[in-house]
Structures are given as structure tokens and as C-alpha cells.
Swiss-Prot record:
It comes from Mus musculus. It comes from the Eukaryota. Belongs to the UPF0739 family. This is UPF0739 protein C1orf74 homolog. Signal peptide: none annotated.
Length: 263
């Protein structure tokens, strides 16, 4: 796969994602999006959440097909719609990640307001989530069998899901928040020190780095979660070494305290 000029990547995004009354994404956003999509295709993350504007499934399908036509992507990426949110997914890598999640490689932090402080949960303590993950794996396995029909699309009904938890898993985080859906408007993270992890990679010369991951864990639980975080970093560095599209992987963390945390 070749890397088209930045001008072509920007044009592909603006011509497909900025149609009609939607505002065209700015140049920097277009290039960052292309980098994120390429990172998904190269197995550096299972999925990316599209949040540049209100473009829907058809526009995203056109965008990915345009990138394929430029020789930027191989066929195989998938669009997953959950509620009003759209993800660009690598079914192959997402399956691998979800299967590992069922084996306990991802930790969950319960931040329900009813608790005095956050606490760690395992996937085995969340049976409804286990069932949901298994269902998504089954759907993705079916998709991997045929990539010849253009960019495929799946819509999942999510009325009773904890979207915060599901999104964290799909985005490849080693730790995902969960909470009581009956009190979804609040949590116990207010004024709680959080360790925020970020992973960045370099791509186009002269352009800002690509933000690959950004997630947080309560600082008080960092010792209990360290093995999950170390395993995630090791796996990411292994996958990074196996590709040649990006350079300069940088993983860092800082502790912040916020008056309120929206999930």
C-alpha cells in the first residue's frame, strides 16, 4: 500500500464526509482521521470512533472506498453503528481483542455513584457484558469471510448497554469503566486523581503526531491494574514493530484531578 499525498487524503475526506449541509472537516482533522484509520488497518487498535462531524454510514462507506481507490487501504475494514455512534473497525483485530477480553486481559473499574470509591471488576463478574462480547465476536467472524462486497456495515441495538464500557473495549483500552446504568448521570470520580495514559505515533513528515490511545485509570487503583497496563503496552509495542507505516511510538502518563468526569 502506498501513501497518497496529503492533498489527496484531505480531498477524499472533504468530498465524502462534508457533503450536503455538513461542514467539511478541516485539513488537520482529515489527516489525523486518515492516520487513525490506517492505524486500525495496520492492527495498532481495533477501531476508531468517528466524531469529526455528523456524517453517517453511507458517507463513511464512501470515504473508506475512496481511500481504497487511492491505494491507501486494502479492503476489509468495517463500519459498526451503535446507537448514534459509528466506528471504523478491523474485524480481524477486533475479534482477537474481544476474544482476549473474554479471557481476562481487560480490567473493568466500577465507578458507580453508590460506591464510596472506584473498584476493580473482572469480566467474569459482568455476565451480561460477556454475552454481548460473544455476540459481537460471532458477527465479526462472519464478516471476515467475505471482503469482496465493498465496505460492510453492521448496526447493533444498544438500548440496554453500558456504552461507556462497550466503547472502551472496542477502542482497545486495557481498562474500561463500568457503572450502574440506573445512575448513569453520575459517578464516583469527582475530585479523584486519575492517571491519564496517551500513546502517540509519528506519520506524515511535518505533521502533528497521531493520538493513538487516550484513557485513564484511578490513581488509587494503579498498582492493582499495573499488570493489565504493562501487558497492553507490551502488545502495542510488538504490533508497532511489525508495521512500517508509522514511527516513534511514545507512551506517557500524567496524573490529573478534575471537579467532574463525564463518561
Amino acid at each position: 500500500m502506498s501513501t497518497p499525498s496529503p492533498q489527496l487524503l484531505v480531498a477524499a475526506a472533504q468530498q465524502t464526509l462534508g457533503m450536503g449541509k455538513r461542514k467539511c472537516p478541516p485539513r488537520a482533522t482529515c489527516l489525523h482521521l486518515a492516520g487513525e484509520v490506517l492505524a486500525v488497518a495496520r492492527g495498532l487498535k481495533p477501531a476508531v470512533l468517528y466524531d469529526c462531524n455528523s456524517a453517517g454510514v453511507l458517507a463513511l462507506q464512501s470515504y473508506l472506498e475512496e481511500l481504497q481507490g487511492l491505494g491507501f487501504l486494502e479492503p476489509g475494514l468495517h463500519i459498526l453503528e451503535i446507537g448514534e455512534n459509528n466506528f471504523i473497525v478491523s474485524p480481524e483485530y477486533a475479534c482477537q481483542h474481544l476474544e482476549q477480553t473474554l479471557l481476562g486481559t481487560v480490567a473493568f473499574v466500577d465507578v458507580s455513584r453508590s460506591q464510596p470509591h472506584p473498584s476493580v471488576r473482572s469480566v467474569d463478574q459482568l455476565p451480561d457484558l460477556k454475552s454481548l462480547i460473544a455476540d459481537v465476536i460471532t458477527r465479526f467472524r462472519g464478516l471476515k469471510k467475505d471482503v469482496s462486497q465493498g465496505v460492510s456495515y453492521t448496526r447493533l441495538h444498544s438500548s440496554d448497554w453500558n456504552l461507556c464500557t462497550v466503547f472502551g473495549i472496542l477502542l482497545g483500552y486495557p481498562v474500561s469503566y463500568t457503572f450502574d446504568l440506573n445512575r448513569e448521570d453520575d459517578n464516583c470520580l469527582t475530585m479523584t486523581p486519575l492517571r491519564v495514559f496517551t500513546a502517540r505515533i509519528s506519520w506524515l513528515p511535518g505533521q502533528p503526531s497521531i493520538l493513538l490511545y487516550s484513557f485513564s485509570v484511578p490513581e488509587s487503583l494503579f498498582p492493582a491494574l499495573k499488570n493489565f497496563l504493562s501487558a497492553w503496552e507490551k502488545e502495542l509495542r510488538t504490533r508497532f514493530r511489525a508495521q512500517n507505516a508509522f514511527a516513534d511510538l511514545s507512551i506517557s502518563s500524567e496524573v490529573v484531578t478534575l471537579p467532574a468526569v463525564a463518561l
